[in-house]
Regions:
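Metal-dependent de-N-acetylase/amidase catalytic core
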Residues: 1, 78-277
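Active-site rim/loop-helix segments in enzyme catalytic domains that contact anionic ligands
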Residues: 1-91, 116-127
């Protein structure tokens, strides 16, 4: 299973997608501030690669998830976690791959805890370990390119596969400009290597003392320019969201009976019931 925050992230793992043909969960529709989904471009690419959409596929707009963060609405993210855990168990998944938490975009970071929570729940339900891997979304990939990643799943694309990967990325209309800029900055060879790094289920990104995540600085500039009314902040929004999320997951794991029910109005596992706001 591959789990990404936004459509288009899968382009980074084009070789792995073609090799494995996983189910792909896309949390948001990629509509951004303009409100235009780019999900159809991802669907076309997945089908060409032999992959398939998962049960969560652009279910939320970017506006919805940011509003949930601002309102501390952990229920939205818990619902996604339970649904992903359900799929992992029913599809007998061996390992899950997803966005890394880098402090770049809050949804990337929240996607990481959704994956971690789902893997923990699915492991409890199934009774055997499930692998959890991340890949670099926006950060530096120097160690991957140099082959210095410890304990990773590492793919090196041949020339034909690399050419297809780059061509497909440039043909993704909504992201072609970003792809072209990345190629000019890093070179085509940077796309040859695809590395999946094992990660702890409860891993989360935290800023250095006195520092701010990229998304906080970006949000502040948007507020100052009048484009946003409020911006997502780590200490005010994301850290409390993490705490509430893991409190709920821990209660589920600590419950005496491992039962789960998913419905339109409630989620339950081990007797813990969460009602959507």
């Amino acid at each position: 299973v591959l789990v990404v925050a936004h459509p288009g992230h899968e382009l980074t793992l084009a070789g792995w997608l073609t090799t494995v043909g996983p189910s792909v969960f896309v949390m948001t529709d990629g509509s951004g501030q303009l409100g235009r989904s780019r999900l159809h471009s991802t669907t076309k690419g997945l089908l060409n690669a032999g992959a398939r959409p998962g049960s969560i596929y652009g279910d939320f707009s970017d506006r919805q998830v940011y509003e949930a963060m601002l309102k501390h609405d952990v229920d939205l993210f818990l619902r996604a976690t339970f649904e992903l855990a359900d799929w992992i168990v029913l599809d007998d998944v061996d390992y899950v791959v997803g966005d890394s938490a880098e402090g770049y975009n809050p949804m990337h970071d929240v996607c990481r805890i959704i994956i971690g929570g789902a893997v923990e729940l699915a492991t409890r339900l199934r009774g055997r370990p499930i692998g959890n891997y991340e890949y670099v979304v926006t950060g530096r990939r120097d160690h991957c390119i140099a082959g210095r990643c410890a304990g990773t799943i590492r793919l090196r694309l041949d020339d034909a596969a690399l050419e297809r990967k780059v061509a497909d990325a440039l043909a993704y209309p909504e992201l072609a400009g970003e792809v072209d800029a990345a190629i000019r900055r890093d070179g085509i060879e940077a796309s040859r290597y695809e590395c999946l790094h094992p990660v702890d289920n409860r891993m989360s990104w935290t800023p250095a003392e006195g520092g701010k995540p990229h998304y906080e600085e970006h949000g502040e500039s948007r507020v100052a320019s009048g484009k946003y009314q409020r911006s997502v902040r780590y200490a005010e929004h994301i850290a409390p969201l993490y705490a509430a999320f893991w409190e709920n997951i821990s209660e589920c794991l600590d419950a005496p009976a491992a039962s789960r029910m998913v419905g339109a109005s409630s989620l339950q596992m081990g007797g813990r019931q969460i009602r959507p706001s």
